[in-house]
Amino acid sequence: MLAATMIVSVLAGCGGNQNEGNTNEKENVTNSNEDTQSVSAETNENGDETLTVWCWDPTFNIYAMEQAEKIYQKDHPDFKLDIQENIYNDIETKLITAATSGDYSTLPDIFLMQDYSFHKNIANFPGIFTELTDSGIDFSQFTEGKLADSTAEGKNYGLPFDNGATIMAIRSDMVEAAGLTVDDFKDTTWSQFEELAKKVVEANGVPMIASSGGSELLMEMLQSAGASPIVDGKVHIADNEALKKTMEVYKKLVDEGIIAEYTDWDQYIASMNDGKTAGVINGCWIMSSIQAAEDQSGKWAIVNMPKLDGVDGATNYANCGGASWAVSSNCKNTELAFDFLKSTFGSSVELYDDLLPNAGAIASYIPAAQSDVYNQASDFYGGQAVYKDIVGYAGSVPAFDCGAYYSDIISALTDAITNVVQNNADIDGEMNNAQETLEFNIEN
């Protein structure tokens, strides 16, 4: 359900181009920063060490902020957070309302933003952000692919939080029934995976991989190849060779019964829990859904995803989903906000050690993988130290540019792959249609 909520929020939060309003927005950045400096000085004089935060999910994001507050209070006993729960759609609405009205006084000091919403909001509403590039946070300690989501023109606007690294979770018992091992599926190409998967399908009578339909898996495959649908701010669909290979592979695997598509999310999850599939490729957050089937403990394993054959720079790594912390232009004490974020989510292994077992939050902070907590074996995954492996995967994810048009790209590619899979439509023709659709939507 977390994943479903994420997808709905992302699609609701991304939208069309609003360049006409950017000039006023840039003016608002300057004015807002001037106001922030004066308010910050007043706040420091009064000795107030309270920051307001907007985020959602009491057991995940809010819990994380509460633990970060406790850690920071060890050296700053007067520090407090005023954490205000808002679902993401409401946060996005409030941010856009503030930006369009030019009144930023309603914004909190810190807010959580879905990663795929950053580029759109930075482009259309830059006045809501305080830039973090010179905040003192060491961004080199976070994965390149994750950072790209909240970075624009070389400037940082978000501090990465949870990890959406792509995994391939497979049923080890079904793999063994085919005379194979889990290790056989590590570091494969898609052609190698295809041959292995055929054996698993034949031995167990179920598809190798469940897909939630649409273009989610396509986007992960494309990113793993180091390719993007946007290049230098322009749509790059029609002549995108990596995307064409991705669609060809996906279509072939569906036709061969290796991938089974589910358009209903509950049925998609049930396919894993009920033994109707031998695996799944998705962001690592899918693990919580897999683990709902307690009777399958010890029967699952995690490996990296296959990579595209014949593509220079192709990898076995991608990312799907996640969120990052941002500081608003209305922050009343930017120095305090910067130091709090730097000292907690930006550097505290202690914090991430708490969040993993108690909230299920896997870090995007690379050094967290070296801690004892991340090295602990998981009984559910047959004794594998899955969290260490996942953070390692995240460190190898290529950067991926969807610009400000993520939802438009998802929609266009979903239409394209649906026509290819269900109607045997020509791939080149569908890519051209997607290109034209995106260019029209962006220009209008």
Where are these regions (language model features)?
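Conserved N-terminal structural module of periplasmic/extracytoplasmic solute-binding proteins
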Residues: 8, 12-119, 137-139, 182, ...
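Hinge/lid segment of periplasmic solute-binding proteins
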Residues: 37-43, 112-167, 192-196, 202, ...
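Ligand-binding clamshell of periplasmic/extracellular solute-binding protein-like
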Residues: 54-65, 83-147, 160-170, 184-194, ...
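Short helices/loops that flank or line small-molecule/ion binding pockets
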Residues: 92-106, 174-175, 194-199, 266-280, ...
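C-terminal lobe and pocket-closing loops
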Residues: 119-121, 286-297, 309-412
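Extracytoplasmic/periplasmic solute-binding protein
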Residues: 153-161, 166, 176, 191-236, ...
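Conserved C-terminal helix/tail region of periplasmic/extracytoplasmic solute-binding proteins
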Residues: 176, 182, 255, 364, ...
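Glycine-centered hinge/linker elements that transmit conformational signals in sensory
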Residues: 195-199, 234-262, 305
